[in-house]
Amino acid sequence: QKKDKKDRFYGLF
């Protein structure tokens, strides 16, 4: 699984 900057950002939600 690759997590991009956006993925990490949305991960907070």
Swiss-Prot record:
<keyword id="KW-0873">Pyrrolidone carboxylic acid</keyword>
<feature type="modified residue" description="Phenylalanine amide">
    <location>
        <position position="13"/>
    </location>
</feature>
<feature type="modified residue" description="Pyrrolidone carboxylic acid">
    <location>
        <position position="1"/>
    </location>
</feature>
<dbReference type="GO" id="GO:0005576">
    <property type="term" value="C:extracellular region"/>
</dbReference>
<keyword id="KW-0964">Secreted</keyword>
<keyword id="KW-0027">Amidation</keyword>
<comment type="similarity">
    <text>Belongs to the tachykinin family.</text>
</comment>
<protein>
    <recommendedName>
        <fullName>Tachykinin-like peptide-XIV</fullName>
    </recommendedName>
</protein>
